[in-house]
Amino acid sequence: MVKRGDIYFLDLNPVIRSEQSGMRPCVVISSDAINHLNQITILPITSMKPTYKTIYPNEVYLPKEVSLLTKDSIVLAHQIRSVDKKRLIKYINT
């Protein structure tokens, strides 16, 4: 069962314009009370590049030690999306 706070790899294609695309980690933010439905609400995660100097108010820093991802990352809260569970590829961590 998908739970709020879980991190999964999702296939976010197809997308339009500047939406986050491809297979990438995402954190589930929808309520556990509705996560049994076919759709869940997620925030995509992107790897943190060494050139990043600022974390913006609509971003959350996610160290690799916490997420179990291979790199320090940033949760992109401004890219909130509802997606079908068929996009779930692989469970990573809670």
Where are these regions (language model features)?
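Conserved functional hotspots at enzyme active or ligand-binding sites that engage polyanionic ligands
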Residues: M1-T94
